[in-house]
Amino acid sequence: MGSRPASWYEELEPPPALAEFVDRLWAQGIGDADGEGEAIYDQPVLPDGALDVVAVDDHVILAGPATRTTTVELAPGALTVGVRFRPGAAPGLVGASAADLRDLDVPLADLWGPDGAVIAERTVEATGWQARLQALVRGLIDRLGDARAPDPVGVGIAPLLADQPGRPLTAIAEDVGLSERQLRRRVEDAVGLPPRTLARILRFQRFLRAARAAGPGRHLARLAADAGYADQAHLTRESRDLTGLPPAALLTWEDNRLQR
């Protein structure tokens, strides 16, 4: 196998037509397209507060917002592409409440009927990750005529919670002119998660971004404090709850297996 990576991963900016709804496009491959590489690649999928349209092999699904880490087994040569929605923006284009999609993987044909089946067919028939992404993007652009604008409260809550993770929800609700109950309902419909669950996930993702940037010599206690955790023990509890692993073990796994 030589120096062939176990996994490669690419991210791209969305086209301007989808920028109101989509955060990024992404692709991941396992080994080489000829099937060389590890027998099975166990890919953890961590909660990130987002919904994705994902195409892997001959399946195209909408992956709802996750509250827990799951593991996907990818075969040698597997090619996965996806479109990640901005937190809170998906319902306007998807046509369903994000709360109804929580922790679910829904085939596109089940979600959008014949239109979804056509998008899925064109995507899986495309050759190469760029062509697959283009087919998926074209399918989403074709749906823009029936889309509604994202709920500004739903879209605005993620950056607000990320910047002020400890702020009382009542204060945030007052800022946007809603009762706390109304805010919870709007956020769950748009994002698919209760506000405090979303805040926990965003804080953990903030820690992960900083830890990945720091590399193997990272100082976990300092990174935990910078991300808003009370101490390293607090970070460890949250990491175990969200991923099943302590942070050091999770990051060591990434250091050893992923090329970013």
Where are these regions (language model features)?
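Short glycine-biased active-site loop of nucleotidyltransferases that positions the nucleotide triphosphate
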Residues: 243
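DNA major-groove recognition helix of helix-turn-helix
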Residues: 187, 199, 238-239, 251
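Alpha-helical bundle regulatory/interaction domains
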Residues: 1-180, 190-195, 209-230, 246-260
